[in-house]
UniProtKB/Swiss-Prot annotation:
It comes from the Bacteria. The lineage of its organism: Bacteria, Pseudomonadati, Spirochaetota, Spirochaetia, Spirochaetales. This is Small ribosomal subunit protein uS17. Part of the 30S ribosomal subunit. SUPFAM superfamilies: Nucleic acid-binding proteins (SSF50249). The gene is rpsQ. One of its GO terms (biological process) is translation.
């Protein structure tokens, strides 16, 4: 039975030097609990790119998946915007 509610994130490709793998940086805004100021919190995840179609600077959508390797738990779904 497949789980339907998998996480989807949008981020920017910051590295494409590995084969079939891209590093995606996800930037989120979180509010500080005391000072009520919004902070930019970023994290970098490795995502599987089977066809090696994304390039450095592309805006991509990734989805959570089964573990593909030691650090890869995300797959590339689509490229939302190409880099210039």
């Amino acid at each position: 039975m497949a789980r339907e509610n998998k996480k989807e994130l949008i981020g920017k490709v910051v590295s494409d030097k590995m084969s079939k793998t891209v590093v995606v940086e996800i930037v989120q805004r979180k509010m500080h609990p005391i000072y009520h100021k919004y902070l930019k919190v970023s994290r970098r995840v490795k995502a599987h790119d089977e066809r090696e179609e994304s390039k450095l600077g592309d805006k991509v959508k990734i989805v959570e998946s089964r573990p593909i390797s030691k650090e890869k738990r995300w797959r590339l779904i689509e490229i939302l915007e190409r880099s210039k």
